[in-house]
């Protein structure tokens, strides 16, 4: 039985991989960095990626020793692997693809390119030198890798085109609220959720006068959010998609959720806060004018961005978005066409099976 090792470090990558691997891979032994969802479809866990997942240089320091311990475990398991699928997570995977090549892994696939177009463009060269295939999920990324003749580059669209769809009917969703719902997305990692709760606590009370503020999140964070902000949380699968389809506007921490909201046609404000040192270093390195993929793809600031800004500035930004929601919604309508046609998951599954 051929062996596939999965290396990933965040929930978005896990969601895409879950959808791809849940059918057609019965003849393969798949193991690696996992979560509960991946384990349910038979992926064997070497470690949970949540143990090493973090954002920013300063934020990562407390997890260094844990990371090194898990990394040694990964290398031990890679020795008899036929295929490595490295998903995004450049801090982990750019080192891992080099070590995998040294260990004699036959086939190395990089799925979801690091954002080399935003910063550290030399990472593309590292991927080209150590990988056999790169599968990109943004239309303009294919061009970046075309200059490397020995690397096979693939693009079939963005998985979110298939995945972003409502789970409940509007009537079923709305009956839980007395006021208009206002989705609040705080992030997917514990550190960023804690920072954003602290940042937004002051304006949530103000917003609750006019809206039912709801926070779609993961089960492990729901009690903390409910206790600190006194808002309702939603933890069922696809809750954020229902929020985006059935609300007029949202407050969203920068990340995949902004693109999901954009695909759903939901006007929103993008905010984010990191350690000041991380922000200072990042600002010097990043080469793109926007942080949200929505704005990058549409080539203008359709959804306003508030990075390292005060809660009052974020509140004013939200009020402006809410007033202009129809205009913003119209501009968001072109995103699906930019990101590819439907059946992206099926095409990715077929591509992976062809490669491995």
UniProtKB/Swiss-Prot annotation:
GO terms for cellular component: membrane. The keyword Lipid biosynthesis applies. One of its GO terms (molecular function) is lipid-A-disaccharide synthase activity. It catalyses: a lipid X + a UDP-2-N,3-O-bis[(3R)-3-hydroxyacyl]-alpha-D-glucosamine = a lipid A disaccharide + UDP + H(+). Belongs to the LpxB family. It comes from Aquifex aeolicus (strain VF5). PANTHER family: LIPID-A-DISACCHARIDE SYNTHASE, LIPID-A-DISACCHARIDE SYNTHASE, MITOCHONDRIAL-RELATED. The keyword Transferase applies. Pathway: Bacterial outer membrane biogenesis; LPS lipid A biosynthesis. This is Lipid-A-disaccharide synthase.
């Amino acid at each position: 039985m051929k062996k596939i090792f999965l290396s990933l470090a965040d929930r978005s990558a896990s969601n895409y991989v879950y959808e791809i691997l849940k059918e057609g891979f019965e003849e393969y032994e798949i193991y690696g960095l996992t979560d509960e969802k991946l384990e349910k479809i038979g992926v064997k866990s070497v470690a949970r990626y949540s143990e090493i997942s973090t954002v920013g240089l300063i934020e990562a320091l407390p997890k260094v020793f844990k990371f090194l311990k898990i990394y040694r475990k990964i290398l031990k398991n890679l020795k008899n692997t036929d295929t490595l699928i490295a998903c995004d997570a450049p801090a982990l995977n750019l080192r891992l693809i080099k070590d995998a090549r040294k260990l004699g892994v036959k086939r190395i696939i990089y799925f979801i390119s690091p954002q080399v177009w935003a910063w550290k463009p030399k990472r593309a060269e590292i991927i080209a030198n150590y990988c056999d295939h790169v599968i990109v999920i943004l239309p303009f990324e294919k061009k970046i890798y075309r200059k490397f003749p020995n690397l096979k580059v693939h693009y079939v669209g963005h998985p979110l085109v298939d995945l972003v769809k409502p789970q409940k009917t509007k009537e079923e969703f709305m009956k839980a609220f007395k006021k208009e719902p206002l989705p609040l997305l705080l992030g997917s990692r514990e550190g960023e959720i804690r920072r954003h709760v602290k940042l937004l606590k002051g304006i949530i009370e103000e917003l609750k006068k006019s809206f039912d503020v709801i926070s779609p999140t993961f089960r492990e964070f729901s009690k903390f959010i409910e206790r600190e902000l006194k808002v309702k949380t939603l933890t069922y699968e696809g809750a954020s998609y229902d929020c985006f389809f059935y609300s007029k506007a949202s407050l969203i921490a920068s990340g995949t959720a902004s693109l999901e909201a954009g695909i759903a046609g939901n006007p929103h404000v993008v905010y984010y806060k990191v350690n000041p040192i991380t922000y200072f270093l990042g600002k010097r390195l990043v080469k793109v004018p926007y942080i949200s993929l929505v704005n990058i793809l549409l080539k203008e600031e359709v959804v306003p961005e508030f990075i390292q800004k005060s809660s009052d500035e974020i509140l004013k930004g939200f009020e402006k978005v809410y007033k202009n929601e129809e205009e913003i919604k119209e501009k968001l309508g072109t995103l699906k066409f930019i990101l590819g046609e439907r059946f992206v998951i099926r095409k990715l599954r077929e591509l992976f099976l062809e490669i491995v």
